[in-house]
Amino acid sequence: MAFPQTSFFTCVQKLQAALQRWAGQTVPLNCGDSFRLHGIDQSNTVVGLDDLFFVVQDDHFRPKDEVGMQLLNQELINTGTLRNSFFPQILMTHGENLDLSLKFLFQGRFQVTVYQSRADHDPVALIEKILGSDEMAAVNVPIGAISALPRGVRLFWVARALSDACVLFDATWQAQAPVATEGRMVVVIRTFGGAAEVQRLLASFNNQSQTGDYGQMLKNTFFIVYDALAAKNTPPYIPSGQDYPLNVFVLSGPNMGGAGNLSLELLALQKAAAGAGIAVNELVVADDDVSLSLESLARHWATTLFRTDQAFYTCPIFLKSEPRMMWEDGGLWGRYTQENPSGQRRAVAPRLLRHAKIFHGSDHLGDMARLHHPEYSAFIFLSLPFDRLAQLGLPCAMFLRGDDIEYSLRNIAAGGVTVSNPNLAAWHEPAHSYAQEYMSIAHGVIINMAYGQRKPDDLATFFHRRAAAHLSLSDVAGLTVYAEALADLVACDRLLQPNFAPHYLSVIARFKSFDAAFSVMADELVASLTASSAREGKVTVTAPFLYMDAYSGTDPLDHVVLTNSHTDRRCIYDPFEPDRLAALSSVAARLYASLSVFIQNFDTLRAHYRQKIAASADPAFWLAEAEGKSFEVLHGE
């Protein structure tokens, strides 16, 4: 297809030139070259989280990142933790067989012990060595073929100083390249209003690059940032006048949501890489507000160098606000949920795997060592072979919510799998709003129809139950979300359509008025309101703003307090205010009318949206979306 002569094409040409310059300085791996699989992660900046990085005990030294790790006699470093244990199962299953070794760069005298550990078993010492040198020295400790390790094993090492003034400069799990590879990885990040978050992430990578041997990985990694509608006063992504090790290209364009911005970014990358005639091996999609260490990114690069299949790779996601809590490690869509415990795809909800696990010390590490295959991965962190992109197509036009689930299920339908890498970890914060719920439901129903749900009964029951809950509390806002999602689904002219973004932007603007009804309110005020209602023989109901239970109490309602836990804001209203009841009746009538159409035309709707997913995944769809729009290169020309 001929590329339109637009400003988008101009950006692609500039990206092509940047990729050619990058390819000229990447460092390929030749057969037999040693490479770094897994180093020490010292990126913790959260007070009180040390035990996720190193075992904390009386004789344990907490390492600094200045001039190595300086230890006194009998002080030790124990890496048997979440962030510094080595979990080899993903390599054993999805990669070439590698000969493993542990390389120490040190000065002084150390006792080094390598342990293996499995779930429900005490750690077993594999190797113990005494290392000694008055000068800085490097020693390789051979471990053996990775295929010879037990399934579900976790490896870690303990180094104890046997004299004063010992220094451990570095320690890395290493392997030798079984074949040659270019080893090129592209990381794509898209943002709308989150430029500062992306800049902080890149700055953290720059700072951490000084603390480890990341040179080859950074030379072989190219970052592309799509900053939608970038503000004119946005600070530069890369500080001027500094020796900067990251290869970064930033472009700006229209805001088409997370999915649309990503598809435009990937389309530009595909066209530019093809025009430059260069091979890209791995593609990483990362969120703009993710917190990820450079060590995690380096481990990921090494893990994918000699992959033997086209699996999607993801990683455990922890909460920024509760950094010991894992929020998800991938998930299943519409199956094995509380509402639908079966394996059939019947629910419009995810089953988050390893959800809400709390990590202290070695808790859950045996479970983490096992191979973990979720059904889908969020675009918080997802990686795939670059060639897989051409086979699967681009993310479809879902603006926000569900685009990553659909893409993962598309991969499975094409014979792929998703696997989580426990050697990595990312921190992120979930959010939810009325507009996001609209998109979650509308897109969730489309996903179910496209990937397995062949009858409308369970979906109809879902809408009936949600309507009953919101009607019982006279909640106009929540009921409107489901009414509008259903109406737009059955209309067939609003979702996954050409020029799709304006519809979503209008939805977001419309639902912001509902969000604006929420405000910060002290607990004691809610308690006073509750007590006042009780004195009058009535009840004030406090409920989440979405997914509340239907009110079934016998006491008459006095007030309703809806809470959005993501924003810590509340909305209080009188459920029997006349205008509210009139609006509630009108919205309910629209919802049930749309639901009737949905049930009667389910097969037609299912065929329609399956076709629309395929159409909006085609590069031609996104070329048309880009036509006539304004784009600009902000950095990397």
Regions found by a protein language model. Give the residues of each.
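Donor nucleotide-sugar recognition loop
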Residues: 377-381, 390-409, 415-421
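A recurrent flexible, glycine/aromatic-enriched loop bordering the glycosyltransferase active site
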Residues: 346-381
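Acidic donor-binding segment of Leloir-type glycosyltransferases
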Residues: 205-251
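Short beta-strand-to-loop acidic/aromatic patch adjacent to the donor-nucleotide binding site
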Residues: 276-291
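Active-site donor/metal-binding and catalytic loop motifs
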Residues: 170-177, 420-435
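Conserved donor NDP-sugar-binding/catalytic core segment of glycosyltransferases
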Residues: 295-347
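Glycine-rich, basic loop-to-helix element that forms the pyrophosphate-binding segment
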Residues: 253-275
